[in-house]
């Protein structure tokens, strides 16, 4: 597995704003979309291109377009939805495959409760999105599911990653590349990333009054 920490100044700036304890739901949601878009730029920079001709204002012009596999974006519900709009702003033609994964707060293990994959997903590049890579159990479960469906080219984008989660994915799926805005320090005893962002799902959806 390859972990790519994207330290672009715009990403560092926006991530710093997201770490504020008093950030509003609106601002957190907007920043999650913006950082998601910036990560998408990095995660797709090696996509193959092909040349074709069009009629321009001055005659025939050779231009380029993305070639090869089509893309499906795979948000891990629910928090992954918070990055989806930003990702689709750059690749609007991508199909969306939703995967629902819940984590047991006592055991920190994940179980899949929803699987809505696009047809012929085995012929697509699958790009998983989830704000937090904490224990790695949700990410591993999602990759397991995608590989079972026949996916061979899988990438993941997360806002923040813990070393423990990175290690878990690397052990289970060394072929998957992860793009992240930050590799943070560690997990606490409750499985939350330190310093992290808090509960990204609650902050995106406004389900806790203190984050509203």
UniProtKB/Swiss-Prot annotation:
Activity regulation (UniProt): Allosterically activated by GTP.
Record keywords, A-Z: Allosteric enzyme, Glycosyltransferase, GTP-binding, Magnesium, Nucleotide-binding, Transferase
Enzyme class: transferase
Reactions the enzyme catalyzes: UMP + diphosphate = 5-phospho-alpha-D-ribose 1-diphosphate + uracil
Keyword flag Acyltransferase: no
BP term (GO), one: UMP salvage
Binding-site list for uracil: 193, 198-200
The keyword NADP is assigned to this record: no
Pathway noted in the entry: Pyrimidine metabolism; UMP biosynthesis via salvage pathway; UMP from uracil: step 1/1
Binding residue positions for 5-phospho-alpha-D-ribose 1-diphosphate: 78, 103, 130-138, 199
Family matches, as Gene3D superfamilies: 3.40.50.2020
Intrachain disulfide bonds: none
Superkingdom of the source species: Bacteria
Record's cofactor remark: Binds 1 Mg(2+) ion per subunit. The magnesium is bound as Mg-PRPP.
The enzyme's E.C. designation: 2.4.2.9
Cofactor(s) the record lists: Mg(2+)
Matching InterPro entries: PRibTrfase_dom, PRTase-like, Upp_B, UPRTase/APRTase, Ura_phspho_trans
Family under the similarity heading: Belongs to the UPRTase family.
Reported function: Catalyzes the conversion of uracil and 5-phospho-alpha-D-ribose 1-diphosphate (PRPP) to UMP and diphosphate.
Entry protein name: Uracil phosphoribosyltransferase
Organism encoding this protein: Pseudomonas fluorescens (strain Pf0-1)
């Amino acid at each position: 597995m390859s972990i790519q920490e994207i330290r672009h100044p715009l990403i560092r700036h926006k991530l710093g704003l997201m770490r504020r304890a008093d950030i509003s739901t609106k601002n957190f949601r907007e920043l999650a979309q913006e950082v998601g878009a910036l990560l998408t730029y990095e995660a797709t920079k090696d996509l193959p291109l092909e040349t074709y001709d069009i009629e321009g204002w001055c005659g025939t012009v050779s231009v380029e377009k993305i070639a090869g596999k089509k893309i499906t974006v795979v948000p891990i519900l629910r928090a992954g939805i918070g990055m989806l709009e930003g990702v689709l702003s750059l690749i609007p033609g991508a199909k969306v495959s939703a995967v629902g994964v819940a984590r047991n707060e006592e055991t920190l293990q994940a179980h899949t409760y929803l699987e809505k994959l696009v047809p012929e997903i085995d012929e697509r590049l699958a790009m998983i999105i989830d704000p937090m890579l904490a224990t790695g159990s949700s990410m591993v479960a999602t990759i397991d599911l995608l590989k079972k469906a026949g996916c061979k080219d899988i990438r993941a984008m997360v806002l923040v990653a813990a070393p423990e989660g990175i290690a878990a994915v690397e052990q289970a799926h060394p072929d998957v590349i992860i793009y992240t805005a930050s590799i943070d320090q560690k997990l606490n005893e409750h499985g939350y990333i330190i310093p992290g962002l808090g509960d990204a799902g609650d902050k995106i959806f406004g389900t806790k009054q203190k984050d509203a």
